[in-house]
Each structure stands twice: as C-alpha cells, then as structure tokens.
C-alpha cells in the first residue's frame, strides 16, 4: 500500500516503478491537513501530551500523517494479513523487489511486529556511516540480509515498513483516541504499545527528500529549532566512543551465542 496525498503529484513516478516490476499495489489517499477545520483538529489531537513528550506542538501535517497510517493499520487488522506500507516519495532498491517482497509472512512475524525497511532523511552517501555508528545489537539472517534491533531507536521516519496483524492490533490499541505522538516515534510504540520494532539491514527503501519537496517538512521546520554545525563537531568524539562500545557489545553477544550454539550441538551429539 502506498500512502499519498491526492494533490501531491508524486503518484506517477512510483506507480511506474512498481508496474515495471510487476508489483500489485494500491494507493491510499492520505488525510490532507489543509482540510482540517479548527474544531476538528482540536478533537483529533492532544496537544498537552505532545508537548510533554517533545517540548513542542505537532504540526497539522504530522497529525494527518499519523491518522493516514492508522487507517492502514485498521485495514491490516480487518484483512488479517501483513502489509508493506510505503510513502509516495519512496525510492526502492532492487533487493526490495527480489527479496523483501517474496519473504514469507510467518518468517517476518517471528522476528517482529514491525520491520523498518528504510530511514527518512538519510542519503545513500551516508549509508555506510549509518551502519557503522548504529549497528544492530541482535539480528537474524534472512536471504543474505539481517533483521534485528539497533542500539537506539528514534523518530527515523516511516518511508517504508512491514507490519503484521499482531503489530496492527497493538498499534491501534495503544494509539486509540486523539493523536498524542509522532507516527514514527518508534521508542514510544515499543514502550507504550509493547510492540517489537525491528530494522532491516541493509536498507532497501529510501526517501527522496533531496529531490522532492515535502509539505510535512516545511511545516515542521517552522516549529523545530535548528542546531549549529559546531554542536555536531563537539559531539563527534562522544559518537566515536559510543561506536567502540557498541561494537564491543555486538562482538560479545556473537561470541556468547556462538558458544551457546556449540554447547547445544555437543549436548545433542551425546
């Protein structure tokens, strides 16, 4: 399913890509924030909860985005089948078509309730750095790729993800009522909703943020303070230290799992 504003003008591009690969897909009209009336917005959104979590209000676009995806979760629940959700500015790698689309539903369901297939606002030129600084703590192999849990989960976008019926059930249950958080606040879905959120590596879905304008980002930038480059420079030594610790933990986990596997094999041989 592809979430798309009817007025966005983006549908032709992604429809051509999907049709080229013979993929069965449908567009779902996203809720248009520009059509909100003040009274309606107040009913659909809990500003106090949002400000308590983020220190700012959510934009009308962010609220509309959440409501749009919630409609899809309801469809997953009613159909009883998992779904891959894409936004209309998604760029798709070949592995999306040759691997991800043919993976068994039950195999993915054993790994998580939601599997993030990509990350918003990440350019391909920074892909290797992202994997280096944000390794998966624990992961399972599937078709030469990995699905696992990163050390840190954050608001990394919803440009592409897989969701199971169980995931849809949990998501709908804990987000019932007025919108009070960002759609892509994955730590919130994990902690408040009890959902298992995994990530695919390498990513197969990218956001065309460098070439396509976004209503949501334009609105959000007016409410979010910008940080200077000096801050990134000061934090770089901290990031390097954290990187070393994380990879040490990954190595320790791999050694422990290998030792456990070896012990199980010896026990079975007896």
Provide a role label for each language-model segment.
Residues 1-86, 90-270:
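An acidic/histidine-cluster motif and surrounding catalytic segment
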């Amino acid at each position: 399913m592809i979430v798309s504003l009817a007025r966005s003008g983006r549908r032709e591009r992604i429809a051509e890509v999907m049709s080229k690969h013979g993929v069965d897909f449908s567009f779902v009209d996203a809720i248009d924030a520009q059509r909100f009336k003040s009274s309606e917005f107040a009913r659909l959104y809990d500003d106090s909860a949002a400000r308590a979590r983020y220190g700012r209000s959510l934009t009308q676009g962010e609220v509309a985005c959440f409501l749009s995806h919630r409609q899809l979760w309801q469809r997953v629940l009613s159909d009883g089948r998992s779904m891959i959700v894409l936004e209309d500015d998604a760029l798709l790698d070949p592995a999306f078509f040759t691997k991800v689309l043919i993976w068994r539903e039950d195999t993915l369901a054993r790994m998580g309730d939601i599997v993030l297939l990509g990350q918003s606002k990440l350019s391909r030129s920074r892909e290797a750095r992202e994997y280096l600084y944000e390794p998966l703590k624990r992961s399972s192999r599937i078709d030469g790729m990995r699905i696992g849990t990163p050390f840190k989960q954050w608001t990394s976008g919803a440009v592409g993800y897989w969701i199971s019926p169980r995931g849809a059930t949990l998501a709908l249950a804990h987000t019932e009522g007025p919108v009070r958080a960002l759609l892509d606040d994955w730590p919130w879905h994990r902690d408040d909703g009890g959902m298992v959120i995994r990530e695919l590596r390498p990513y197969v879905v990218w956001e065309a943020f460098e070439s396509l304008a976004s209503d949501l980002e334009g609105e959000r930038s007016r409410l979010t303070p910008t940080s200077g480059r000096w801050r990134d420079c000061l934090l770089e030594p901290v990031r390097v230290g954290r990187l070393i610790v994380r990879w040490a933990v990954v190595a320790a986990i791999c050694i422990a799992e290998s030792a456990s596997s070896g012990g199980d094999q010896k026990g079975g041989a007896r």
